[in-house]
Amino acid sequence: MNCNYFGICASCTLFDKTYEEQLNYKIQREKERFSNFTNIDFDIIKSNESNFRNRAEFRIWWEKGENNKEILSYAMNDFKKNILKINSCEMVSFHIKELMPKLIDELQNDLELSFKLFAVEFLGSSTKDMLVTLIYHKKLEESWIQKAKEIEKKLNIKIIGRSKKQRLVLTNDYINETLNISNQNFFFAYEENGFTQPNTNVNVQMIEWVLENTKNSSKDLCELYCGGGNFTIPLSTKFRKVLATEISKTSIKSALRNCSLNKIESISFIRMSAEDFVQALNKVRAFNRLKDINLDDYEFDTIFMDPPRSGLDDTTRNLAKDFENIIYISCNPETLHRDLEELTKTHEIEKFALFDQFAFTNHIESGVILRKLKD
């Protein structure tokens, strides 16, 4: 990676390797980790070597310059956890990279916008829609709104101002994204404080990998931890109906909007924890949130799960064992390994993929497809 801060900024921990070297290091590490479960070839989804992140956050650093003038810089940590001032980042998308110096100049030249600013968040899309969140240690007044609106117009971006107990949305709080997945366009609105996959190119390939390895079914899909519908919406093309659950209110709001954007009517989204949903499926207790949904109308043959780093709990692992097909996307190989110890008692691994979402870091994501063992 051609970066002025490579090997200094602590964001890229595998700085001593080329892209292929760091990828091979992670591949071999994970093959060894999962060798007790399978010896099949892993599918490998590579990242671009640079400019792959459509989401980024930087601190703002102030210092005195010539004539005692306050100078603003973006900042990260170095490997000793000291402040490292930066003026660019090669991990972020070209659009964010291009915007960074323009934005800091505009902020620098206006005390109303720069005073007590301590962080900036960027959320971009492949459609060049851009949302910038400015985070302050001060109350934001009407004068700030007027100044920020000028920057919105000049830089063709959307701005949100945040401070303690304040969230000022100047235009709207989401960006529009179009993903071409298996030669079909899908439309998404990504919210400022919602979860999105930061590496758009790898995200598309992750979804395509799932679709390519999922047969068309006349039955239904159950999804846990659906987020904003990133996988749900494309996967709905493979099933009669989809029932998807998510605990986050923000994510459910996004999922419903995204479903509407794609004119899909075969998905029902429920704001409910995975644990409560299992109780509902097993008829342990009734839930008001399911009053308009008859679970007996569903004939599930596949479960899709994309859990947080903590992985599955005992309840969801036991639920998954009842399905013919399990699709498991994991952001933590340690908890995936733990979960597979149970899931492989009833299912066999058919496909295994590694997704290099975060190049030059130790992190790698995984995808596993399992089929029920025949009696």
From Swiss-Prot:
Entry GO CC: cytosol
A GO molecular-function annotation: tRNA binding
Top-level EC class as recorded in UniProt: transferase
Keyword flag Nuclease: no
GO biological process: methylation; tRNA processing
Parts forming coiled coils: none
Catalytic residues identified in the record: 331 (nucleophile), 365 (proton acceptor)
Reactions that this protein is recorded to catalyse: uridine(54) in tRNA + S-adenosyl-L-methionine = 5-methyluridine(54) in tRNA + S-adenosyl-L-homocysteine + H(+); uridine(341) in tmRNA + S-adenosyl-L-methionine = 5-methyluridine(341) in tmRNA + S-adenosyl-L-homocysteine + H(+)
Keywords tagged on the record: Methyltransferase, S-adenosyl-L-methionine, Transferase, tRNA processing
Keyword S-adenosyl-L-methionine appears in the UniProt entry: yes
InterPro entries reported for this sequence: MeTrfase_TrmA_AS, SAM-dependent_MTases_sf, TrmA_MeTrfase, U5_MeTrfase_fam
PROSITE patterns, per the entry: SAM_MT_RNA_M5U, TRMA_1
EC number: 2.1.1.-, 2.1.1.35
Positions that bind S-adenosyl-L-methionine: 197, 225, 230, 246, 306
NCBIfam families registered for this protein in UniProt: trmA_only
Family per record: Belongs to the class I-like SAM-binding methyltransferase superfamily. RNA M5U methyltransferase family. TrmA subfamily.
PANTHER family reported for this sequence: TRNA/TMRNA (URACIL-C(5))-METHYLTRANSFERASE, TRNA_TMRNA (URACIL-C(5))-METHYLTRANSFERASE
Function: Dual-specificity methyltransferase that catalyzes the formation of 5-methyluridine at position 54 (m5U54) in all tRNAs, and that of position 341 (m5U341) in tmRNA (transfer-mRNA).
Name of the protein described by the UniProt record: tRNA/tmRNA (uracil-C(5))-methyltransferase
Gene field: trmA
